[in-house]
Design a protein with these regions (language model features):
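C-terminal and inter-domain tail/linker signature
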Residues: 1-127
């Protein structure tokens, strides 16, 4: 499995409350800057913040760059928590040391369109 595949799978499981792969992939001293709260957080706090995505469906991902030490990945999300469906794109930079994630930062941009429209994928494929 590539770093991108592992990262995507770990995040999808964690958003559903299963942190087994996160615990395997992330270094215990991993740091994550969370833009929602404006703080650098540790792995325990990051895991708690991941529950904010429980109503979000994540679509396909695209690797921007990947090597032994770094992964840059772009993903789409759809959140149905509100009356109006929110669409977003997320770009994550992930640093590795000794094959473990030691730093992770994600920037989110909300979209005014459904990124699945006109594409060869749909949200139902990722529910």
């Amino acid at each position: 499995m590539t770093k991108a595949e592992e990262f995507d799978k770990a995040r999808r499981l964690a958003y559903k409350g299963d942190f087994s792969l996160v615990e395997k992939l992330y270094h215990p001293d991993c740091k994550h800057f969370d833009h929602r709260v404006g703080l650098e957080v540790n792995l325990d706090m990051q895991s708690a913040l991941m529950t904010a995505y429980e109503n979000t469906t994540f679509g396909p991902y695209r690797v921007i760059y990947e090597n032994e030490d770094f992964l840059c990945i772009q993903r789409y999300g759809r959140n149905r928590l509100t009356r109006e469906i929110l669409y977003m794109t997320l770009i994550s930079g992930v640093n590795y040391r000794d094959e473990k994630i030691v730093r992770h930062e994600t920037a989110i941009e909300y979209l005014d369109y459904d990124p699945s429209e006109g594409q060869e994928w749909n949200w139902d494929d990722y529910e």
